[in-house]
């Protein structure tokens, strides 16, 4: 249970993340859960209901104790790191909106995360997915929606949150899509005719009227389609056709990157298409590509020991 003044601050912070920082709903929900976990621990640590003053005067021992508690509770390093980032983000918001200055939390470094290589699908698995995704909608417009969305993600390398934010205004430009991604970073991606044509066909039979600024991909009740709903469609596809366990909407973004790299795309162009802030993030795909080449070499090279 939180003090009403603290809850009001959290509500303002969430609006700030969405409206000014352009964070996805998924990120905002995760950050909110992390912050509440931190405040619940603070409540336990202080043995009294947390106040604004408790938050402002939280010392390094409390923060390190919270991180240690998460570690003891078997949170992954990535989850602990994200949790600390969420709480730091909240404190930055407090600096902007209250009298708080230079809190000790900013001196704490995040734990090192184990870097996992992105998992791409094979080109054959992508083809199977694109050919059969329409089988799982039960309603014609939903079937076409599923195919249009999946083709869009694979053809453009969009994050699922970015793809689900596409509006009719995006369709008005014949040559490219202008995307506002993580951290309000803008990038421009060429339209592939197959993706645009499928979206146009889908909109022609969509039973809901939409304004130019409304997201075009809708759920069965007419509300904006949410990532978990679409991923459930992919789970059906995965199980029926025996596709890899790591098949999700995001794996098609990874596949877009890996397949372009395997077919000769350069890293700088790939970085621009994916919207990566750092080239080192994009370079992870070269490691995946090298593993692919090693596998091909091992199975196909005519001279073996």
Swiss-Prot record:
Record bears the keyword Cytoplasm: yes
UniProt entry keywords in alphabetical sequence: Cell cycle, Cell division, Chromosome partition, Cytoplasm, DNA integration, DNA recombination, DNA-binding
CC terms in the record's Gene Ontology section: cytoplasm
Alphabetical GO biological process terms: cell division; chromosome segregation; DNA transposition
Cell compartment(s), UniProt: Cytoplasm
Record domain Core-binding (CB): where: 4-95
Subunit comment: Forms a cyclic heterotetrameric complex composed of two molecules of XerC and two molecules of XerD.
Annotated function: Site-specific tyrosine recombinase, which acts by catalyzing the cutting and rejoining of the recombining DNA molecules. The XerC-XerD complex is essential to convert dimers of the bacterial chromosome into monomers to permit their segregation at cell division. It also contributes to the segregational stability of plasmids.
Family of the protein in this entry: Belongs to the 'phage' integrase family. XerC subfamily.
PANTHER family found in the cross-reference section: PHAGE INTEGRASE-RELATED, TYROSINE RECOMBINASE XERD
HAMAP family given in the database record: Recomb_XerC_XerD
Annotated protein name in UniProt: Tyrosine recombinase XerC
Organism: Rickettsia rickettsii (strain Sheila Smith)
């Amino acid at each position: 249970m939180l003090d009403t003044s603290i809850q009001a601050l959290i509500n303002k912070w969430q609006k700030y993340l969405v409206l000014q920082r352009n964070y996805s709903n998924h990120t905002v929900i995760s950050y909110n859960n992390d912050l509440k976990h931190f405040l619940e621990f603070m409540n336990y640590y202080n043995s009294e209901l947390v106040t604004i003053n408790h938050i402002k005067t939280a010392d390094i021992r409390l923060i390190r104790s919270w991180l240690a508690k998460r570690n003891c509770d078997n949170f992954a390093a990535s989850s602990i790191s994200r949790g600390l980032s969420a709480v730091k983000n909240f404190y930055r918001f407090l600096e902007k909106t209250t009298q708080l200055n230079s809190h000790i939390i900013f001196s704490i470094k995040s734990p090192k995360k184990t870097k996992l290589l992105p998992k791409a699908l094979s080109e054959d698995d992508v083809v199977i997915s694109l050919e059969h995704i329409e089988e799982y909608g039960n309603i014609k417009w939903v079937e076409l929606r599923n195919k249009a969305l999946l083709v869009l993600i694979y053809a453009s390398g969009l994050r699922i949150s970015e793809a689900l934010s596409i509006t009719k205004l995006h369709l008005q430009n014949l040559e490219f899509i202008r995307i506002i991604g993580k951290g309000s970073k803008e990038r421009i991606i060429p339209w592939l005719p197959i993706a645009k044509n499928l979206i146009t066909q889908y909109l022609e039979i969509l039973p809901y009227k939409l304004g130019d600024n409304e997201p075009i991909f809708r759920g069965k009740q007419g509300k904006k389609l949410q990532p978990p709903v679409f991923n459930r469609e992919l789970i059906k596809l995965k199980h029926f056709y025996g596709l890899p366990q790591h098949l999700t909407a995001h794996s098609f973004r990874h596949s877009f990157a890996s397949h372009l790299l395997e077919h000769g795309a350069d890293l700088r162009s790939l970085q621009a298409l994916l919207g990566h802030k750092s080239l080192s993030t994009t370079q992870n795909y070269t490691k995946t590509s090298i593993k692919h080449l090693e596998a091909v070499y091992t199975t196909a090279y005519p001279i073996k020991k």
